[in-house]
Amino acid sequence: SYYTDSKKKKTKEPKKSTYEDTLELWKQNLSIYEIAKHRKLTPQTIYNHFAKLIQMEIVQLSDILPEDKISDLRAAFKDFKGESLGELKEIHGDKFSWDELRLYKASLG
């Protein structure tokens, strides 16, 4: 009916989530650091967005990290039982950044 049609036109597009904003910039081939600068956020925040996007299965871990790094992370996480990432960070030191550990953990579902 006319009434419901006109009502539909008034509904605004849902506001994009901060994750979607990050994803759009990523699709424009901006690096994580460029996205952070563009959005006036920290790289840490952008990495957190990607962890969320990986959990939501919108982005693949392999879109962000190189295969050799994923392979190393896979080995590091082999006996991981969901405990604190701090233990892995302690064992592996600077081999992995906190962000890499978080991204990999997000990919575990």
Residue ranges of each PLM-predicted region?
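Accessory DNA-binding and partner-docking regions appended to nucleic-acid-acting proteins
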Residues: 1-109
